[in-house]
Amino acid sequence: MQIVDQMRDQAFEELNLVNDKKSLDDIRVKYLGKKGELTGMMRLIATLPNEEKPKLGQAVNIAKEALQNAINEKLAKFEEAELNEKLASEKIDVTLKGVGQNQGSLHPVTKTLNRIEAFFKQNGFAVEVGPEIESDYYNFETLNIPSHHPARAMHDTFYIDDTHVLRTHTSGVQIRTMEKQQPPIRIIAPGRVYRCDSDITHTPMFHQVEGLLVDKDVSFADLKGLLHAFLNSFFEKDLKVRFRPSYFPFTEPSAEADMECVMCDGKGCRVCKHTGWLEVLGCGMVHPKVLKAGNIDSENYQGFAFGMGVERLSMLRYGIDDLRMFFENDLRFLKQF
């Protein structure tokens, strides 16, 4: 039995030197594992006289139990220390001032789009969208701009291939809508458009909203009244609006809509180049050829169309003088909205 006591004492001496869980497990395996030293002592029982067997078995079991209890106690201390360390590292001082979350806001272009859509929805217009990679057919041909037409020079176009472009306007949505829907039609088509131009007032990508109304007995007076009401609503002012004759291949007659300068109330300033007027959108009565391309009978139905640059309206509403600021992701700029 002396050898069992010596083995037990040796195990406890080694146990006292252990400082981590891995070393602790090594001792458990060394003495209590299937091939452990104390476990191996049980095999000697078969070689002993019958009267000695119970004594050795009892001594080994007592030693194994004492060592297992000591190992469990030490393991519990290690786990408690680990838990305390983790709790300390994750400790929260509830007396400290909280860290607030920064509140985001909508981009000014998004706000402008929302204002535009809200007005026209209130006036019975639906919102329609279309592909940004558009066919030459929908971007030009159906809008009375054939391949030989000089008006194509007005557009600095990004060509994907010989028959597809990055759309230069959202007018193609109007044709697609007329093809699938008979009058009365009231839609606006907001979206990104692309032109090869970049300066203080132009970017290669910008946003447009185009509108279309097709019905019986539609007149230019209806168009003027709608757009005047829109500008008054958008700028929250009772504005003077004038319509100047212009040219667009897809409308006849065509006009440019100017409004009283919102910066100087029409008195003349740098923004309006001291004229008192600001050009804000183009419009006109839908050309019969465009109605025909959309499978609309131009003898029985008339329509008007209009288009506006969203960034242009944003700049005027918020007093921004450089279009490129909308796309620079500068928080100093965006936080103002």
From Swiss-Prot:
Which Gene Ontology BP annotations are present?
phenylalanyl-tRNA aminoacylation
Tell me the Pfam families matching this sequence.
Phe_tRNA-synt_N, tRNA-synt_2d
Cofactor(s) recorded for this entry are: Mg(2+)
> Where is the protein found, in the record's own terms?
Cytoplasm
**Disulfide bridge partners, by residue number:** none
Quote the subunit structure annotation.
Tetramer of two alpha and two beta subunits.
| Protein name (record) | Phenylalanine--tRNA ligase alpha subunit
- Identify the gene encoding this protein: pheS
